[in-house]
Amino acid sequence: MTDATPRRSAYSRLLDRAMRILAMRDHSEQELRRKLGAVLPGKNEEEQEQATPEDIEKVIAWCHEQHYLDDARFAERYIASRGRKGYGPQRIRQELQQKGISRNACDSAFADCEVDWEQQARDQAERKFGAPLPRTFPEKAKVQRFLLYRGYYMEDIQAIYRNFE
């Protein structure tokens, strides 16, 4: 007995895959390209195939037309999400660039976001080290290292102490 369903084209399988990927969360164009470039799954090893660049381009273009793929929207949402998790602008910018977002798109997304990075740095420091922030030099250095690791700029970190001394 043979399989009665006809084999779907690589393009339609790629389109389905893109929709499943984008249904989970927003992705940058580079992330989606990378994920679509992997081997298309099949029922068995003979049916697995590599997606062609032309099919990937068509799927990416279709996703842009349908507004499912938008790097600017992705950057805005990513900044908001990572900011809520306590990461600073420097680290978020680096992560966005690793995900294929251009420097100009990053700059415009950060300009549009309404996050007070200095206040957020203060909140993170107080959450980690307690409400009256440490005043001795070794403890201040510890706070600075923590906030630098989280991706805050040194100006924001210094402003925490400057504004409350």
Curated annotation (Swiss-Prot):
A cellular-component GO term for this protein: cytoplasm
Keyword Cytoplasm: yes
Keywords (A to Z) from UniProt: Cytoplasm
Domain of life of the source: Bacteria
Entries under Pfam families matching the protein: RecX_HTH1, RecX_HTH2, RecX_HTH3
KW Acetylation (keyword) present: no
Entry's localization field: Cytoplasm
Signal peptide: none
One Gene Ontology biological process: regulation of DNA repair
Reported function: Modulates RecA activity.
UniProt family annotation: Belongs to the RecX family.
Protein name: Regulatory protein RecX
Species whose genome carries this gene: Cronobacter sakazakii (strain ATCC BAA-894)
Lineage: Bacteria, Pseudomonadati, Pseudomonadota, Gammaproteobacteria, Enterobacterales
